[in-house]
UniProtKB/Swiss-Prot annotation:
Keywords: Amino-acid biosynthesis, Diaminopimelate biosynthesis, Hydrolase, Lysine biosynthesis. This is N-acetyldiaminopimelate deacetylase. The active site is at 73, 132 (proton acceptor). CDD domains: M20_Acy1_YkuR-like. Belongs to the peptidase M20A family. N-acetyldiaminopimelate deacetylase subfamily. It comes from the Bacteria.
Length: 384
């Protein structure tokens, strides 16, 4: 079995070879190398042709009544690493700045344990590409990867959290992560000389009014005790100071803790865009793309069981956490299969997606121990 030091070395290697969504070829090869060294007696491995960097590993149980799924993500971010670590990224401009190297290492540790300790139930480990973008979970589902013996009856997954103490398990009933929608807005007016505004139609003025109007959606259309966010983080317009811009481009994101809230915000944004178009005589083209980034809604019964187990396990430090407005594409899979997502504390001053993120590696073994004990307990249960 993999020891703690071996697991840390695995994490270091994974950290050095980060790859972007759907490009995780080196990561895939290394994962297959590690998995190939495990005991194979009751393992089956699927490398799907239509999603070639994905890996599914089935652990056949001794007397299964269900298949317990566990998912980990394997892609990285377009971030230039600034940690100064001796095992820093060797791929320029790409970094495991969201801790997916930790996620993979924990998953490998849990898989290795059950490769050596055959469980009662079947287990399904899904090493998923393209979480940060390209909606890898949705792709996998729509490609039919979870059909037949590869279908989980329930799905679990974790995300590292630098705001929690090392090794802490955090979870909650209900929504853990927000759903997200990408927003792209093009405002089309008419360019012209700055000295003759009456002969042009200023896209910058219309875009500015649109941005200000959007700020009223959350404050006046959403219940104040519920959480919703619209951030318009990018505005591009114009080429020179004395030319009225005929085109402005706005990009942003919508976040909501329920699908209903996201759809409400989407509708109100459409209303605002239509109003600005009429008010300023411009064309406003709005594109909304949610893809597979639905809210991560934990199944009530399974999550209650998970929380009770963690609370009553003396080896686990458990805390209840608030919903997070960050997105996670595991939400799509949880819309198809009941399951639970939870946090693993990795205690660091840096936040997720920052170039200096350095997760505390003491969380790896603690995460593995908590998961193996829970999956063993769950596998022995006869009830649904």
């Amino acid at each position: 079995m993999l020891g703690t030091e071996e697991l840390i070395q695995i994490r270091h290697h994974l950290h050095q070879i980060p790859e972007l969504a759907l490009q995780e070829t080196e990561t895939h090869a290394y994962l297959m190398e590690v998995i190939g060294k495990m005991e194979q007696d009751h393992l089956e491995i699927l490398e799907p042709e239509d999603l070639p960097t994905a890996i599914l590993v089935r652990v056949n149980g001794t007397a299964p009544v269900r298949t317990i799924g566990y998912r980990t993500d394997i892609d990285a971010l377009p971030v230039q690493e600034e940690t100064g670590l001796p095992y820093a990224s060797t791929h320029s401009g790409v970094m495991h700045a969201c801790g997916h190297d930790v996620h993979m290492t924990v998953a490998l540790g849990v898989l290795d344990y059950f490769a050596s300790h055959q469980p009662k139930d079947n287990l399904l480990f899904f090493f998923q590409p393209a979480e940060e973008s390209e909606a890898g979970g949705q792709r996998a589902y729509e490609l039919g990867l979870f059909e037949g013996k590869w279908r989980p009856d329930e799905f679990y997954g974790l995300h590292d959290n630098p705001a929690l103490k090392t090794g802490v398990i955090g979870c909650r009933l209900g929504t853990l992560f927000a759903g997200t929608t990408e927003v792209d807005i093009d405002v089309l007016g008419k360019d012209g000389h700055a000295a003759f505004p009456q002969e042009a139609n200023d896209a910058v003025v219309a875009a500015a009014a649109l941005i200000m109007q959007v700020q009223t959606i959350i404050s006046r259309s959403i219940n104040p005790v519920e959480a919703g966010v619209i951030t318009l983080g990018k505005l591009e317009a114009g080429t020179i100071r004395n030319v009225i811009a005929g085109h402005a481009r706005i990009e942003g994101t919508i976040r909501g803790l329920t699908q209903e809230m996201i759809e409400t915000i989407d509708r109100r944004l459409q209303d605002v865009c239509e109003g600005i178009a009429k008010s300023f005589g411009v064309t406003v083209n709005l594109a909304l793309n949610q893809g597979g980034y639905l809210p991560v809604e934990n199944d009530p019964a399974l999550t209650k069981r998970f929380i009770n187990f963690m609370q009553n396990n003396p080896a686990v430090d458990y805390v209840e956490t608030a919903p997070a407005m960050t997105g996670e594409d595991f939400g799509y899979l949880l819309s198809k299969f009941p399951g639970t997502m939870f946090w693993l504390g990795v205690e660091d001053d840096a936040q997720l997606h920052q170039a200096t993120l350095t997760p505390n590696e003491g969380a790896i073994q603690k995460g593995i121990d908590a998961l193996t004990s829970f999956i063993t307990y769950r596998s022995q249960a006869e009830e649904d």
